[in-house]
């Protein structure tokens, strides 16, 4: 261990890989507290669709960055990094081990490495204005949208192909939110870790993972996911950014009579599998992870290996 830096354990992996169970059992072994590294579990009232850990599952282990915002609030990597850094300091000062567990790659990466992020947080009123302006651009074709971007950020326009509409919209959205140019954004990864980090990941075959994801979606639906989404819509949260998350956006058309339930469930499973694939690509390409093979290691075997590395 590097005594000059706070020691943290980070557990990553795709959705439905078992991060929650492993992190809780590890916390029991090493006197740890858990910081959620999930961009959606910060929201209240969004429990089933985010696979949020229940009080029973916590089993007395303190969890942080869960249920801290309303669904109409915004949350960013900048906010996560700021809050997580404060929590790590507090947990460490109390003689315990911070365990960050989650699947939001950018959040984890921004915390571990020396990322400088700008605050993109906006108020609900500001976000509404930004959405209105973006909606007004929907009628533009790709080239017209690219020309619009070039009017205020020529550098980004030069680096983004006109057919890459998503990246173009991202640059425009960034400008509308911050009044700054995405091309000037200071976001530097220096590959010097802020912490003495034990970075672990849970992996398994794609076939096994996809089977677990499909089963988890069925369990979520059995536990009342549809009703959860329905209640959020009834409370006026339908147009919120948080409701674009997988598990929520697929069921809204059913509630509005625009899609049949079975098709929405199929979309939900497909989107979840695609998201898991993107997560694994991120972790394997952008982070130096020590992988634990869930198919060939029991929970106890994984815990034994982790505690051996800590010693």
From Swiss-Prot:
Cofactor(s) needed by this chain: Mg(2+)
Membrane recorded as keyword: no
Record-level Gene Ontology MF annotations: ATP binding; tRNA dimethylallyltransferase activity
Keyword Aminoacyl-tRNA synthetase: no
Broadest EC class assigned to this enzyme: transferase
Binding site for substrate: 15-20
Pfam families: IPPT
Region (Interaction with substrate tRNA): 38-41, 166-170
Keywords per UniProt: ATP-binding, Magnesium, Nucleotide-binding, Transferase, tRNA processing
EC number: 2.5.1.75
Reactions that this protein is recorded to catalyse: adenosine(37) in tRNA + dimethylallyl diphosphate = N(6)-dimethylallyladenosine(37) in tRNA + diphosphate
InterPro entries (UniProt xref): Dimethylallyltransferase, IPT, P-loop_NTPase
Single Gene Ontology BP annotation: tRNA modification
Residue stretches in coiled coil: none
Gene3D superfamilies: 1.10.20.140, P-loop containing nucleotide triphosphate hydrolases (3.40.50.300)
Site label Interaction with substrate tRNA, positions: 104
Sequence positions that bind ATP: 13-20
Similarity section: Belongs to the IPP transferase family.
Record's function text: Catalyzes the transfer of a dimethylallyl group onto the adenine at position 37 in tRNAs that read codons beginning with uridine, leading to the formation of N6-(dimethylallyl)adenosine (i(6)A).
Subunit architecture: Monomer.
Protein name: tRNA dimethylallyltransferase
Source organism of the structure: Staphylococcus aureus (strain MSSA476)
């Amino acid at each position: 261990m590097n005594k000059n830096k706070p020691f943290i354990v980070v557990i990553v992996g795709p959705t439905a890989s078992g991060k929650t169970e492993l992190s809780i059992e590890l916390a029991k072994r090493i006197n740890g507290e858990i910081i959620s590294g999930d961009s959606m579990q910060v929201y209240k009232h969004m429990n089933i669709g985010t696979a949020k850990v229940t009080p029973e599952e916590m089993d007395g282990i303190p969890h942080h960055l869960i249920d801290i915002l309303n669904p109409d609030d915004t949350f960013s990597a900048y906010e996560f990094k700021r809050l997580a850094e404060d929590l790590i300091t507090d947990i460490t000062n109390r003689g315990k081990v911070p365990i960050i567990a989650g699947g939001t790659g950018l959040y984890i990466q921004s915390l571990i490495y020396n990322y400088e992020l700008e605050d993109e947080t906006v108020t609900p009123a500001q976000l509404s204005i930004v959405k209105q302006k973006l909606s007004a651009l929907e009628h533009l074709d790709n080239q017209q949208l690219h020309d619009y971007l070039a009017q205020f950020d020529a550098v980004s326009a030069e680096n983004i192909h006109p057919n890459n509409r998503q990246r173009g919209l991202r640059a425009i959205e960034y400008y509308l939110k911050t009044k700054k140019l995405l091309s000037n954004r200071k976001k530097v990864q220096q590959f010097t870790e802020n912490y003495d980090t034990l970075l672990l990941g849970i992996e398994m075959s794609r076939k096994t993972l996809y089977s677990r994801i499909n089963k988890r979606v069925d369990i979520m639906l059995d536990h009342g996911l549809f009703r959860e989404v329905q209640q959020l819509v009834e409370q006026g949260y339908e147009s919120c950014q948080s409701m674009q998350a997988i598990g929520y956006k697929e069921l809204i058309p059913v509630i509005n009579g625009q899609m049949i339930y079975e098709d929405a469930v199929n979309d939900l499973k497909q989107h979840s599998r695609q998201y898991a694939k993107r997560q694994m690509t991120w972790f394997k390409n952008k982070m130096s992870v020590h992988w634990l093979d869930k198919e060939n290691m029991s929970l106890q075997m994984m815990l034994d290996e982790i505690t051996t590395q800590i010693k």
